Amino acid sequence: MASKKREVQLQTVINNQSLWDEMLQNKGLTVIDVYQAWCGPCRAMQPLFRKLKNELNEDEILHFAVAEADNIVTLQPFRDKCEPVFLFSVNGKIIEKIQGANAPLVNKKVINLIDEERKIAAGEMARPQYPEIPLVDSDSEVSEESPCESVQELYSIAIIKPDAVISKKVLEIKRKITKAGFIIEAEHKTVLTEEQVVNFYSRIADQCDFEEFVSFMTSGLSYILVVSQGSKHNPPSEETEPQTDTEPNERSEDQPEVEAQVTPGMMKNKQDSLQEYLERQHLAQLCDIEEDAANVAKFMDAFFPDFKKMKSMKLEKTLALLRPNLFHERKDDVLRIIKDEDFKILEQRQVVLSEKEAQALCKEYENEDYFNKLIENMTSGPSLALVLLRDNGLQYWKQLLGPRTVEEAIEYFPESLCAQFAMDSLPVNQLYGSDSLETAEREIQHFFPLQSTLGLIKPHATSEQREQILKIVKEAGFDLTQVKKMFLTPEQIEKIYPKVTGKDFYKDLLEMLSVGPSMVMILTKWNAVAEWRRLMGPTDPEEAKLLSPDSIRAQFGISKLKNIVHGASNAYEAKEVVNRLFEDPEEN
């Protein structure tokens, strides 16, 4: 991997308009890598540029530069774009643009333009009159609106209450919001604490039933939504017919959002307000709307502290796979690079591929002579499958991988993972990555199918301990599909603890679980039953402190009976208990 020093020597750094204007004074050809501050220049192309610089040996007429679109007015159309863009400037005029890290095309273009410059200098040809191309990103060319419309975006907060979550109204409410022309900018699923409810609803604290309201709002999951009116908001219609599953205005839950610029003008006209629309749809009792600037800021600080910082980010999941030979010989080297490149490994597992699975992952090679050998190799032993998460993760992983064959990688992308981890056993890339977000979703679901299990926080847990446990659960990658506080009946306890009903301590267990409400949860992720049991730790807190000191029982357990949490023993038991405690348990 090239050092920063070498990169600067090879490419002039342009990070403001003044340096851009200065670059346009260059004589001859300047190849400009236009990049975003959050992802940096396209490192995969730097070996090609170094090769061209050395082989052409034309320092007077061949220059390379990297330009940060964020801080250069001229490059405004390329801001917040994921794909690399390369501009070709000849004597200060931008005459060509190539999108994507297309090494062969860039290589050919540079060689042809330098050949022209040599002939012009030798008097063998007149300078061609190339038209200067407009600096408009292809994604913007079909848009009728300016990408920099100065429209003050307005934000409000929608709080979908626990009873709406339990009754599975969340999806309906979100669809209504987006159907009305509003945009759901961010979403956070949480169990509100008493302190948060008292703080956020201080305006009604003097009402006689406020204590009961606080108890209700802390009894289960709430959804906190950041909603913007958008630059084009059509007044909501009265129609209430159901909408399709497509929600174009709603962002993915994996994508973090941004802190709002709260202004006194945040209150919308009443006829355009989200509050009035939800009232007309008979949903206002299930969803509170907050538009007061100060209160919106409170919610932002509490639930979306990185909202502004993450505004331009695009978190994506992708499937990565190390083929058997690479997994066996250099797994640790690959994992180190993955972490160094700021990927988060959400899940990983060893898997021996079936012939059908191998053929699906190697479809791009099916017409090659070595296809059968490749399938044989792919099914010969365990591969390592990973779910990776990163800003622009899918494209960034594909860029790191490089070409599909070792031959092309070594010639054009010697620093790609394909070239770095080439092996004699196969002429193809030893690593795999999904080719689209749709494919990634399908492949992740195949190799890491979701599973749900029962989680229970016992009555003796304090509110602070419950809050800490929920935080640990989320950080472990579990989705809180459903949560509710409930007083368990003896019949329900018997279902939750089917293996201990005849034990001597069962009476003590019944008594302990009857002293107050338990927090009952449906926890969802891949391999959820085993992962939740691992996170809980051994039944005895003293044993847990020795064997699993970071486990929940080691941190919060008091005794075998009061060991703070419980979980199902197996998938069958989990399904039985969840069905008994939650009617028609499914995610909102």
UniProtKB/Swiss-Prot annotation:
Record InterPro entries: NDK-like_dom, NDK-like_dom_sf, Thioredoxin-like_sf, Thioredoxin_CS, Thioredoxin_domain, TXND_domain-containing
Record keywords, A-Z: Ciliopathy, Cytoplasm, Developmental protein, Differentiation, Disulfide bond, Hydrolase, Primary ciliary dyskinesia, Repeat, Spermatogenesis
Region spans: NDK 1: 157-257
Region named NDK 2: 315-455
Cysteines paired by S-S bonds: C39-C42
Gene Ontology cellular-component annotations: axoneme; cytoplasm; cytosol; nuclear speck; nucleus; outer dynein arm; sperm cytoplasmic droplet; sperm midpiece
GO biological process, alphabetically ordered: cell differentiation; cellular response to reactive oxygen species; cilium assembly; flagellated sperm motility; spermatogenesis
Top-level taxon of origin: Eukaryota
Any one GO MF annotation of this record: microtubule binding
Primary role: Probably required during the final stages of sperm tail maturation in the testis and/or epididymis, where extensive disulfide bonding of fibrous sheath (FS) proteins occurs. In vitro, it has neither nucleoside diphosphate kinase (NDPK) activity nor reducing activity on disulfide bonds. Exhibits a 3'-5' exonuclease activity with a preference for single-stranded DNA, suggesting roles in DNA proofreading and repair.
Domain notes per entry: Contains 3 inactive NDK domains that do not possess all residues considered to be crucial for the NDPK activity.
Disease field: Ciliary dyskinesia, primary, 6: A disorder characterized by abnormalities of motile cilia. Respiratory infections leading to chronic inflammation and bronchiectasis are recurrent, due to defects in the respiratory cilia; reduced fertility is often observed in male patients due to abnormalities of sperm tails. Half of the patients exhibit randomization of left-right body asymmetry and situs inversus, due to dysfunction of monocilia at the embryonic node. Primary ciliary dyskinesia associated with situs inversus is referred to as Kartagener syndrome.
Quaternary structure and interacting proteins, as annotated: Monomer.
Protein name stated in the entry: Thioredoxin domain-containing protein 3
Species per Swiss-Prot/TrEMBL record: Homo sapiens
